[in-house]
Amino acid sequence: MDSLIVRPLNEDDYEQVLMEWWRQWGWRAPMRDFLPDNGKGGVMVLDGEVPVCAGFMYLTNSKVAWVDWIISNKEYTDRSGRKQAIKLLVDSLTNVCKKSGAKYAYALIKNESLIKTYEDVGYFKGDSYAHEMIKPL
């Protein structure tokens, strides 16, 4: 593992990187316009030149920011490196939210390993939920 680099998402990342990652994991990708800033409202962590993971943050009209849509490169096989990169990702997204004026960071996650990562950077479990409900308008 080289040094980890955090950079903002750019215009090309959704089509050229993230769509492939969602496909690798067998997940349905969110529509680009469902994501903050049309798919650019987040950051990516790279190991040198290799993209490892990315995530998004929604800033709201309250003091709450939503840190979510964490996705990683399934072909990046350094498990320890992936764990470190995802922790850096969640921490970086949370810090951007704080610098943007949010007082609380919120996330909806189901994956136990990811829940542990969020806890490692200071999140605590709230209520559990059964289903996400979305309605296109």
Labelled PLM ranges:
Residues 1-31:
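Short amphipathic alpha-helix that is part of the acyltransferase structural core
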Residues 32-44, 53:
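A short helix-loop-beta-strand connector motif used in the catalytic cores of GNAT acetyltransferases and
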Residues 49-59, 65-68:
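Conserved beta-strand in the GNAT
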Residues 63-81, 131:
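Conserved acetyl-CoA binding element of GNAT-fold acetyltransferases
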Residues 79-95:
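Conserved acetyl-CoA-binding loop-helix of GNAT-fold acetyltransferases
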Residues 105-116:
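Conserved beta-strand-loop-alpha-helix junction that forms the acyl-donor binding cleft
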Residues 108, 124-137:
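Conserved catalytic-core motifs of GNAT/GCN5-like acyltransferases
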Residues 117-123:
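Conserved active-site tyrosine of GNAT-family acetyltransferases
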